[in-house]
């Protein structure tokens, strides 16, 4: 089901076991974020009208890029990604530096660097409506730190925390239930977190998704987003890795 928010139309596209890709439309144009599966992506684009202008890649992991080339070829779309990580991405038609934008139906979509999960990870900002954050931020959690440093990852999360609180966070995986268990372990007295965890349980029991999620809700409940320092973030990330 498509969601309309601040002039953008956002469609969640489930892929693989627990991935979410995202189809975002504005002004008659559309962009597809992180197509792991070309067939599923093509089906979603065709169901939405059959136009695709951009394929946007957040990072180089195969479960986010495997369908990019075939998807772009099917619709004549351009592929955009981080110029600094181009060697690990499919061929880029638009190799972007942090802060650069693409046009989506008259609205600028800005790429920002959000290293931590990988050193080349980026996030795409669709105006003040949505942020396609890949595996940097998850609902009630964050991605594993495969390549970056705690300082890098914490800075990336703080950059996301500074966005408009009504921004919809377009995360790359359905990990909310497992994240909620850890979050409640480290922050047991957080009422907002308890309510979010209960809601996630209800939604998943009904087979419903927990994403997208408002940034404001994450600011109130996500321990990684609330970490006051890189050192606190590092302790949380290490604890989650062993949880």
Curated annotation (Swiss-Prot):
Keyword Zinc listed: yes
Enumerate the Gene Ontology biological process terms.
methylglyoxal catabolic process to D-lactate via S-lactoyl-glutathione
InterPro entries documented for this protein: Clx_II_MBL (IPR035680), Glyoxalase_II_hydrolase (IPR050110), HAGH_C (IPR032282), Hydroxyacylglutathione_Hdrlase (IPR017782), Metallo-B-lactamas (IPR001279), RibonucZ/Hydroxyglut_hydro (IPR036866)
Q: Which UniProt key words apply to this protein?
A: Hydrolase, Metal-binding, Zinc
For this chain, the annotated S-S bridges are none
Under the GO molecular function aspect, what terms does this record hold? hydroxyacylglutathione hydrolase activity; metal ion binding
Reactions this protein catalyses = an S-(2-hydroxyacyl)glutathione + H2O = a 2-hydroxy carboxylate + glutathione + H(+)
Which pathway does this chain act in?
Secondary metabolite metabolism; methylglyoxal degradation; (R)-lactate from methylglyoxal: step 2/2
Q: What class of enzyme is it?
A: hydrolase
Cofactor requirements of the protein? Zn(2+)
Give the E.C. number(s): 3.1.2.6
Residues involved in Zn(2+) 2 binding? 63-64, 135, 173
Free-text comment on the cofactor: Binds 2 Zn(2+) ions per subunit.
Q: Does the keyword Transport apply?
A: no
What Pfam families does the record point to? Answer: HAGH_C, Lactamase_B
Q: Could you say which residues bind Zn(2+) 1 here? A: 59, 61, 117, 135
Q: What role does this protein play?
A: Thiolesterase that catalyzes the hydrolysis of S-D-lactoyl-glutathione to form glutathione and D-lactic acid.
NCBIfam families the UniProt entry points to: GSH_gloB (TIGR03413)
Family to which the UniProt record says this protein belongs? Belongs to the metallo-beta-lactamase superfamily. Glyoxalase II family.
How the protein assembles, per its UniProt entry?
Monomer.
What protein name is recorded for this chain?
A: Hydroxyacylglutathione hydrolase
- Organism name: Acidiphilium cryptum (strain JF-5)
């Amino acid at each position: 089901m498509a969601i309309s928010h601040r002039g953008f139309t956002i469609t969640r596209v489930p892929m693989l076991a627990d991935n979410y890709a995202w189809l975002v439309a504005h002004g008659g144009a559309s962009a597809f974020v992180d197509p792991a599966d070309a067939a599923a992506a093509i089906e979603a684009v065709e169901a939405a009208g059959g136009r695709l202008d951009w394929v946007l890649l957040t990072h180089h992991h195969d479960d986010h890029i495997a369908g990019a080339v075939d998807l772009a070829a099917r619709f004549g779309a351009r592929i955009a990604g981080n110029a600094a990580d181009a060697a690990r991405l499919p061929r880029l038609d638009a190799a972007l530096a942090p802060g650069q934008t693409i046009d989506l139906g008259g609205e600028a979509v800005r790429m920002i660097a959000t290293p931590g999960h990988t050193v080349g990870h980026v996030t795409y900002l669709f105006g003040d409506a949505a942020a396609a954050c890949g595996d940097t931020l998850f609902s009630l959690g964050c991605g594993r730190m495969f390549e970056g440093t705690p300082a890098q990852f914490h800075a990336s999360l703080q950059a996301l925390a500074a966005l408009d609180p009504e921004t919809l966070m377009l995360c790359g995986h359905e990990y909310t239930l497992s994240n909620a268990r850890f979050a409640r372990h480290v922050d047991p007295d957080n009422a907002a977190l308890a309510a979010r965890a209960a809601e996630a349980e209800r939604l998943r029991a009904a087979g419903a998704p927990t994403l997208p999620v408002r940034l404001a809700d994450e600011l109130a409940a996500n321990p990684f987003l609330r970490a006051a320092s890189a050192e606190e973030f590092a302790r949380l990330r290490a604890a989650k890795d062993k949880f």
